[in-house]
Amino acid sequence: YLDNEYFKLPYDLSGSMAKNRFRNEMLWGLGKMFELYKADKDFTMVFDYVCDVEAHFKEKIEFYQLKTNNSATPYTVSKIAKPDKTGKSIIGKLYSIQCADSNPGIVSKLALVVNVPLKTLDKKVHSAEEEISFEDLDDKSLEEIKKYLTTECNVTDVDLKDCYYIYTSMDLFNPQDSMLGRMINFFVSVYGKEPKRATVLFQTLAHTIEIKAAYERKCSSYADLIDKKGFTKIEFEQIIKKAIDISDESIEVIKKEINLIYPEYSLKTKMNISVASIIR
């Protein structure tokens, strides 16, 4: 009965789509933290305040706006620059940050991060380039973008020297698995070995980001912003250190205790499997 009747009801996937977008933003931001940590940068990541993902440094900030396209077709100049029914465009929302910044300001980078390449007006699909400066686009595409931004942002001069298009691969269906693998690779490259509890470590990092991103109130000061919305390098290191401190010796002690407490082979096997699932 329900097989037929339920699917007559109107459905709404906007909530699920919003949650998936939120999840992709968080995981991409975590990947950015791995990148900055390996580069020995002193950073604080801020999630969902001025922009989707923000990398804060001592005096400058990089802003990243994430977009996904399930159809896998390239984004066009019109797609990113032409305003929608509300009068806002994808790149316009990003460029408005620079318009609001003082001169000289704090913006060092504005980047549109997309899981499909950009197709410019010269018919070129930029699939071989991970990061493109908008200033390096063909003249026709550049002029088209500037034309739209001049009107949308109500400015006479458009400066795109700090604006970029980043083409990045994103697993839209199982992003956690992809990022878990990337986290393990990060750990091996930095510390020379895999973390003892990779799944737990990953869940802790992702949960910390989720808490920061989910805070919805206006921050009263920059210090308040960092406290409520920021994930600092120090906090990141503290979480990583806890994973490193789980020694092989402590795991062996647990296994010996299992052997003493559970003499029956089947129970002993179940307990060892449980331990393995926790520390993997």
Specify the residue positions occupied by each region the protein language model found:
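Acidic metal-coordinating catalytic centers involved in nucleic-acid phosphodiester chemistry
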Residues: 1-16, 69-280
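Catalytic centers of nucleases
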Residues: 14, 18-19, 23-83, 89-90
